[in-house]
Amino acid sequence: MMARIFILALLGQLCFLPYLDAITSSPKVQVYSRHPVDSNKENFVNCFVSGFHPPQITIELSKDGEKIPKVEESDLSFSNDWTFNRLVSAPFDPNSRSEYTCKVTHLTLQEPKVVKWDPENN
């Protein structure tokens, strides 16, 4: 009887192994504009954060070091590997000389990750 319980417990753990990678996973951060910089359309700066687990995360968009108060946040979604994704965006003027950054705080990071929007590599 004890051997059966041991085998069942071992099989249960083996079934769980593929999901261990998702227990903690650091976020990947991309900052880009919704439309090309030279278009005359109303534009948005986007911060797409992907591949993180657990789902608790803080994402802030800033203009010249000041947090942008009104941002749009997508619902939290997840990928096939059970890591999470979120998009945060705000209207902006890409032709201004302002600096836009995205700051991500997550338990897998020793310090927040800050990524600057680069109009040259958009």
Curated annotation (Swiss-Prot):
KW Secreted (keyword) present: yes
GO cellular component, one term: MHC class I protein complex
Start and end residues of each Ig-like C1-type domain: 27-115
Top-level taxon in the UniProt lineage: Eukaryota
Record keywords, A-Z: Disulfide bond, Immunity, Immunoglobulin domain, MHC I, Secreted, Signal
SUPFAM superfamilies in the cross-refs: Immunoglobulin
Gene3D superfamilies documented for this protein: Immunoglobulins
Single GO BP term: antigen processing and presentation of peptide antigen via MHC class I
SMART domains, per the entry: IGc1
UniProt entry tagged with the keyword Signal: yes
InterPro entries: Ig-like_dom (IPR007110), Ig-like_dom_sf (IPR036179), Ig-like_fold (IPR013783), Ig/MHC_CS (IPR003006), Ig_C1-set (IPR003597), MHC/Immunoglobulin (IPR050160)
Disulphide-bonded residues: C47-C102
Main location as per UniProt: secreted
Signal peptide location: 1-22
Location in the cell: Secreted
Membrane-spanning parts: none
Protein's job: Component of the class I major histocompatibility complex (MHC). Involved in the presentation of peptide antigens to the immune system.
Subunit structure, as described in the record: Heterodimer of an alpha chain and a beta chain. Beta-2-microglobulin is the beta-chain of major histocompatibility complex class I molecules.
Family that this chain belongs to: Belongs to the beta-2-microglobulin family.
Protein name according to UniProt: Beta-2-microglobulin
Protein source organism: Trichosurus vulpecula (Brush-tailed possum)
